[in-house]
């Protein structure tokens, strides 16, 4: 495992490094079958700015502690593509996937009140996150378009400022704690443990996503 990745490194090494980096690459719509091509070659073939790609990769890889070179020019279209695809992945794939398996797992719960509470908590969180990302789609991505055109960007609305003052992954941590402390079942617990693993993945994903937006887009 490398501490950081460079343009001359092989893309297949990056993809095989960790699940987190695999997810990052998928959000640039990069197909597999990369052979022995370098990161720069693969990015160029897929019309992705290599420098911006590496900033996001290394930022994620470091857990948000990566300080990219100050002379790095961030390509706004590449950044926008990554953020938009992250929204789609979370709202259309990962969270619905977790909910389906959550319902299956909770069917064997010994406490119907806890089952109801967990599903209700999850659904409320999904709606909150959906609203959060809808606001971002309108304001954050509009800011990216304005920046790319060289326009002076408008002041952030109170709504977008408000949703970026509290970590969006915090409630997922609360949901994990509810399941860990109060969920009981007489059946196989493999499914609920798998759900917890996916909640950890989602929590980290949202943490990095929020950090990237705050780093590049929130003054």
Q: Locations of the language-model features?
A:
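Small-residue-biased structural context
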Residues: 1-219
């Amino acid at each position: 495992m490398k501490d950081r990745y460079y343009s001359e490194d092989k893309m297949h090494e990056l993809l095989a490094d960790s699940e987190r980096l695999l997810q990052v690459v998928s959000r640039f719509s990069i197909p597999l079958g990369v052979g022995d091509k370098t990161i720069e070659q693969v990015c160029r073939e897929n019309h992705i700015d290599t420098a911006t790609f590496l900033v996001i990769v290394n930022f994620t890889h470091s857990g948000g502690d990566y300080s990219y070179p100050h002379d790095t020019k961030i390509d706004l279209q590449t950044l926008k593509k990554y953020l938009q695809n992250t929204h789609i992945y979370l709202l259309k794939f990962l969270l619905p996937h977790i909910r389906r398996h959550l319902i299956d797992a909770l069917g064997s719960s010994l406490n119907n009140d806890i089952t109801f509470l967990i599903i209700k908590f999850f659904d409320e969180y999904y709606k909150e996150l959906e609203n959060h990302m809808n606001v971002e789609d309108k304001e954050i991505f509009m800011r990216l378009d304005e920046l790319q055109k060289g326009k002076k960007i408008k002041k952030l609305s109170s709504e977008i400022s408000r949703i970026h003052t509290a970590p969006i992954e915090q409630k997922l941590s609360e949901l994990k704690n509810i399941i860990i402390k109060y969920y009981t079942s007489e059946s196989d617990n493999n499914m609920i443990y798998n759900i917890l693993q996916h909640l950890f993945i989602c929590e980290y994903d949202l943490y990095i996503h929020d950090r990237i937006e705050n780093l590049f887009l929130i003054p």
